[in-house]
């Protein structure tokens, strides 16, 4: 018995080293798994339009996913399938080229695993070419800083940098947002590339129809395989008026990283 114990004691350092190596390997493999784009409170391509100087604008974003991921996208995440998101976006026109924004609250009134939740808030600074709708070529840059609950994002603090470039080729609009997102880990190579594209046809001054594409390619240093990427194609209709602006759309996921079917509705108006 004493001989067996002696052998066991002599082997303990090797066992500990092996266990440590196994743990390190597991952590490395987990870190190497392709990231999947989390749910979003805002499904929109920015066109460099901002609130007029001195105006306060309120936009309500509502997204419903009747057919989506039935498992959490990360441990503890809200399940997308049958979930409903609602966000209030407040905007103030500071100058003809700068708009200050606040998303409060970012919420999920319903999800199958959490019920109703408050998901966090975002602060936004949007810089654009003044009176972008009057120019053939327009541009802008949007920055967002988010504070998230653990079930909305797997990191508490995240940010978005959204360049805006576009053309008004009346009656067509072509707009591209080459977005990069960060959770402040992993350096520049870990920035997530999540671009969006909109091609719109303006039927009249008040009605437009559009095709939109939203993508999530993964980190810049190594895009995830195509079948694991986030790729959603959308059909959208817009209606503008003096009292309220409406955008509604239906999106279909075309890759394994996207939800199969999502609806969006956006309502906005100036409050002063």
List the predicted regions and their residue ranges:
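Transmembrane beta-barrel domains of Gram-negative outer membranes and organellar outer membranes
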Residues: 37-272
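N-terminal secretory signal peptides that target proteins for export/translocation
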Residues: 1-17
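Hydrophobic alpha-helical segments, especially transmembrane helices
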Residues: 17-22, 270
